[in-house]
Regions:
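Extended, acidic-biased charged interface segments
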Residues: 138-227, 231
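Internal mixed beta-strand/loop scaffold within catalytic domains of large alpha/beta enzymes
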Residues: 44-121
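TerminUS-proximal long segments
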Residues: 257, 261-303
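Compact, glycine/acidic-enriched structural inserts
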Residues: 111-159
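Gly/Pro-rich turn-and-neighbor structural signature
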Residues: 1-76, 190-225, 230-240
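Glycine-rich, often proline-containing surface loops adjacent to acidic residues and nearby aromatics
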Residues: 83-86, 120-127, 175-196, 240-242
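C-terminal, helix-dominated tail/subdomain
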Residues: 230-273
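Short conserved micro-motifs at the rims of enzyme active sites and ligand-binding pockets
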Residues: 71-73, 193, 252-258, 276
Length: 303
């Protein structure tokens, strides 16, 4: 399973970076191959200062070896070996009319002293963070997510959409980071799904990513915008940074376990603002976005 999934994310990384380069038309992804001394490594690809994408990363990694002490405590296990691989991406567009997107698909195994698998699971998801709310874009993104889920279980979309809204929530601001999507974790073999079926589901979601996101980018990338709208984008990006550094389990975990800092922090945007006690004007497009972030909508149901 681990080789099957790693081969899949290698191919998916190629597909996604090629597609985004074609949309941008100016910038290319730079590749950084790195090695983890305890075992494994990764292939980081970063795009910067493009015509469409200001900064973004599409990274894959495959790490293995003894489970670090912090992870032993987290999983409540003793000294065991592990394997983990995944693809993680964050794309920050230049235009405030184009939403930021995040996605992650991952697989984890734990072994006993004889090397037999004692636990294994998939996790992942994809979510959208707009700066200006185009309802048709929100409906499209969620409809694609729902379509991918429905092929495997009619309850998945509702469950994983709810988890996404709950997870990507800035509790200190009382608002969501974005308009959600899917979030799932600890997808283990059970009475209704074996690991091959979970693999089929997770790869279905991965394969849906470009359909969910790129048509939105194409539709919005040439819209005009003002300096004030760009300021709003940078203020909202500040909320993105707050979530990633204050609440995100993956970021905090990486920082606590001596993870690769460049890969961990690649999710942060290049230009951000924090304006003291900032509030959008009443009745403005900016306020409309905030209302939705505070009160999540069932986008797929209204599509």
């Amino acid at each position: 399973m681990k080789n099957q999934f790693y081969n899949y994310i290698e191919g998916l990384q190629d597909q996604i970076t090629s597609s985004l380069e074609a949309i941008d038309g100016l910038a290319k992804f730079e590749e950084d191959l790195w090695v983890r001394k305890e075992g494994g490594g990764g292939r980081t690809r970063i795009i910067q200062n493009g015509a469409v994408f200001e900064k973004g990363g599409v990274n894959i990694s495959k790490v293995h070896g003894p489970l670090p002490p912090a992870m032993q405590a987290y999983f409540n296990v003793g000294e065991v070996d592990f394997f983990a691989c995944g693809l993680s991406l964050v794309i920050h567009p230049k235009s405030p009319m184009v939403p930021t997107v995040h996605a992650n698909w991952r697989y984890f195994e734990m072994y006993d002293k004889e090397g037999a698998i004692v636990d294994q699971w998939f996790g992942g998801g994809q979510d959208l963070t707009p700066y200006y709310l185009f309802e048709e874009d929100a409906k499209h993104f969620h409809s694609v997510c729902k379509s991918a889920c429905d092929k495997h279980d009619k309850n998945f979309y509702e469950d994983y959409k709810k988890r996404c809204d709950e997870y990507f929530y800035n509790s200190h601001r009382n608002e969501g980071r974005g308009i959600g999507g899917l979030f799932f974790d600890y997808c283990k073999a059970n009475d209704t799904m074996d690991m091959e079926q979970w693999y089929a589901f997770v790869t279905e979601v991965g394969d849906s990513f470009l359909e969910a996101y790129t048509s939105i980018v194409e539709k919005r990338k040439n819209l005009t915008y003002t300096e004030a709208q760009r300021d709003w984008q940078e203020i909202r990006r500040g909320r993105y940074v707050e979530f990633n550094l204050v609440h995100d389990k993956g970021t905090l975990f990486g920082l606590k376990t001596n993870g690769r800092i460049e890969s961990i922090l690649m999710s942060l945007p290049a230009h951000v603002q924090w304006v003291y006690d900032h509030h959008p004007e009443k009745g403005s497009e900016e306020e409309k976005l905030i209302e939705v972030l505070k009160n999540p909508i069932e986008w797929a149901a209204s599509a």
